[in-house]
Amino acid sequence: MSNEIKPVCVIQGPVASRSGYGDHTKAICEDMIKWDKFDVKIIPMRWGVCPNTMLDDESRPMVKEVKSRIINNLSVQPELFIQVAIPNEFKPIGKYNVGVTAGIESTIPKPEWIEGLNRMNLNIVPSAFAKEVFVGASYEKRHDNGAVEKISLNKPIEVVFEGVDTGTYKKTNQPYPAMDSAMEAIPESFCYLFVGHWIQGDLGADRKDVGMLVKVFSEVFKNSKNTPALILKTSGATFSHMDKAEILKKIHDIRFPLTGKLPNIYLIHGETTPEELNRLYNHPKVKAHVSFTHGEGFGRPLLEATLSGKPLLTSGWSGHVDFLPAGLANLLPGTLGKVPPSACNDWLVKEAQWFNVDYSVAARRLEDLFVNYIQYIPNAEKLRQQNDEKYNLEAAGKLLVETLNRHLPAFEKKVTITLPKFKKIEAPIVPPATSP
């Protein structure tokens, strides 16, 4: 009698991290477990200094199941290895290797990223933009012996979007005491909301362009009798008191040179549960969402925001335009420009370009949305319905499975053999022969 053993799939990524990569890793783990084709094991990784608290609440669906699959090291080579990371970290550990990355927020990836993608058998990115940038990248690498090697992507790459939990992120009037209590301190009845990290870079050079959002908003609505407010749900890389103080200082330094009576800007800093964040998206005082982002590999917070059914004003370039069609979304025009030196890091290189919003147009759109708000509601509701149907977790999981099925080889089948049990037969004791 024999039993077939499932091939082993090891997923390595920041499954417990409070980050976009953490959300993505956790969703992939859940999809692979539900598929039930593999014996899924998970190797957790850190993601910078982001809090590792994603799996703390075991009452959430699948959390216990995900935690039960966590291992500390590999004892055998897995048939399938899925790594969720930036491409230069990709390592082909399995018999078949899949690299998953949010991709790129600018026009040029580092050569090391293309080399990393080429180490894997298959690569998955969340947007058409990310795929286009990687496919179009080409470099020449000069070796010590003088030989020149052309580097370009030579492995398959597929688009599988990041799904959103539409059971949590949805249009709702349900109160949430913790968030409602924080919002009581805001007197304005019309607030714009930004959600995202405020990371390195001078004014106009942080990737989400939060600094210029603060400046433009302050200038548009200064000295007005009836003014909206801007809520920033943001942080640097941590939720520490020092981080909060630094964010407040940035806001002050941007607004201090401006004259006149400025509109209020409020900071919500610290960790929130998905339910609290969804309540913020849906709070009656939050009327619209806004982001001047320079570029997104996908832009999950923007997708979440659309599910509130409220207008979204954002940049018209990069990964998020997949789920923000021009006919329904309010996309801001702009131009491509060099990534500033203060923004360059391990993945944003000085040779690359990103998107700069036309701030004069953005200013007019902010004002028009405030004055003519009702006119923006129908398209926002249509976009909510469309994204709820197309970009949920189930649809993303289905696409992931379909994509893997197209590419995965037939792994060698392993079986365990159970031998039948036999009764122990005692041999008769024969006395030793004696010599005559």
Model feature map: region roles:
Residues H24-K26, E30-D31, T166-R279:
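Conserved catalytic-core segment of nucleotide-activated headgroup transferases in glycan assembly
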Residues S2, C344-P436:
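C-terminal amphipathic helix plus adjacent low-complexity
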Residues M1-P78, A229, K398, T403, ...:
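N-terminal pre-catalytic "stem/leader" segment of glycosyltransferase-like enzymes
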Residues L122-A178:
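Donor nucleotide-sugar binding/catalytic pocket of nucleotide-sugar-dependent glycosyltransferases
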Residues R279-G297, L307-K310:
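Acidic donor-binding loop of glycosyltransferase active sites
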